[in-house]
Amino acid sequence: MKDTKQQFEHVIAVCRDLFSKKLHDYGPAWRILRPSSVTDQIFIKANRIRSIETKGVTLVDEGIRSEFIAIVNYGIVGLIQLELGYAEAADMTNEEALVLYDKYAKTSLELMLAKNHDYDEAWRSMRISSYTDLILMKIYRTKQIESLSGEIRW
């Protein structure tokens, strides 16, 4: 499991680097996104991955790797938005955004390590296409919960 932690930290470093570069270029413009908009952005990325997996070809010169990076970053943005609520304008500094990014990346690592212990790294035997399908399924679930205004019966 030590390798898993290092691999996670490496992937998060790659994702954070892109997040930081986009913060430099655009600032925290994503602060205006409502939770449903973040959900839709993740859906768009996951749907593109599935389309590429199914068709086997892309017309835009970006592969699935960049889409998975975007899913990670939008996922963290979503967690930040759920904590703070959306804003009418970018209302934080780039540095504040990175502190929050790091907070949720750390929380995600801790959760992954706990689940990894319980599931004994079964995910390593999964196909990439299964990840895509699971992400899409969870997005559809999230959209349904959003449609119900968060009121679920279980």
Please place each PLM-identified region on the residue numbering.
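Intrinsically disordered, low-complexity regulatory regions
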Residues: 1-154
